[in-house]
Every structure is written in structure tokens, then in C-alpha cells.
Amino acid sequence: MESKLAASLAEAGGERRGWWLYLLLCEGDRLYVGIARDPDARLAVHQSGRGAFYTRLNRPVRILAREWHPTQSAALKAEYALKQRKPEEKWSWTIERGPSLVADA
């Protein structure tokens, strides 16, 4: 995954293009899956109460993990697949991403 990201950044002149699949930890140990070009900015929107309905009811605490995708279509497919998983499988997905793709606390 890192080489795909590096290649895309080089092609884009160093700009981060593409989409991020992200997993949020919300209050009550609930999980939320979404995609965004800038997951940190999207987290701020969710935390302000202007994001998805789910995150208005279950305020996000932090980003647990993120995974880069070159296109919105690829990110949407990955989002759908992750949303189909059980909560314990989503936690495993977070661990599988490894330190290079797991967001800082």
C-alpha cells in the first residue's frame, strides 16, 4: 500500500490525491466507517455535530485507522466491504493496517 501511495504522490507533484477509508472510535466504544479526501478535517466536522447522523448520536473520539485508495470508487468499495463486517472484524482490520496506516492517538 505504501508504494501505491508514494507513486500517486509522485504523479500528483507531491499533492495527496485520492481518498481515505477511515474508521472512527465513537463514544460507547462504537465504530463508524467513512471515506474522505482529508480524514482529519472530516473528523472535525463529525465532532462539531455537522457530520453524519450516526456521529451526531455517537460522538467520535478519534480516528483508529485509515487506508488510502487512489480513486473514490475504490474507496467506496472498500467502505462497503468494511461496513459489512462485524464489529470484532473491524477491530481486527484496524490492527491489520499496521503502524504506517494507523492514525496517531
Predicted regions and their residues:
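GIY-YIG nuclease catalytic motif and its immediate N-terminal context
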Residues: M1-P60, R66-W68, S73-K83, P87-E88, ...
